């Protein structure tokens, strides 16, 4: 998980995303007008509620991710916490790659006037990213295909 700045016509907002390392699928995301931890906690809670708990959860060492509100959610769920080395962007390369894609294919092409407009447009892009954008690292599969292909199949009764 990580967050990044999103420039707007006037000012900027912050975009946080939880990414599955295996499939590169964005599991949850949030926009915020502040850097407070709450929007990161919300994205984390959504990812855990909708996709279950991973064995390990990785972030950088930002205050949003080291505070009790955030780490408490992971500890309560029994998830091991992993943090990148200071300034070591390569430790979270899959999220950094997402930021490059979302910025160059969506954000930098727009000048959002409102937070609502940014939320709608970024949401549309992330749905495209998960469902229709193939990745060479995934053997030309989309993140959705890679994510759902690895889940165990249940037989119909």
Short names for language-model regions:
Residues 1-157:
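Charged DNA-binding/catalytic regions of mobile-element recombinases
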């Amino acid at each position: 998980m990580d967050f990044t700045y999103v420039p707007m016509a006037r000012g900027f907002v912050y975009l946080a995303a939880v990414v599955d390392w295996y499939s590169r699928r964005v599991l949850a995301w949030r926009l915020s007008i502040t850097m407070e931890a709450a929007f990161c906690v919300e994205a984390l809670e959504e990812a855990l509620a909708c996709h279950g708990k991973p064995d390990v959860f990785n972030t950088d060492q930002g205050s949003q991710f080291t505070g009790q509100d955030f780490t408490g959610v992971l500890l309560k769920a029994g998830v091991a916490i992993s943090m990148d080395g200071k300034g070591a962007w390569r430790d979270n390369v899959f999220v950094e790659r997402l930021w490059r894609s979302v910025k160059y294919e969506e954000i930098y092409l727009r000048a959002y006037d409102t937070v609502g407009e940014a939320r709608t447009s970024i949401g549309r892009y992330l749905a495209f990213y998960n469902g229709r954008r193939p990745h060479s690292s995934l053997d030309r599969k989309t993140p959705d295909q890679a994510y759902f292909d690895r889940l165990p199949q249940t037989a119909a009764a």
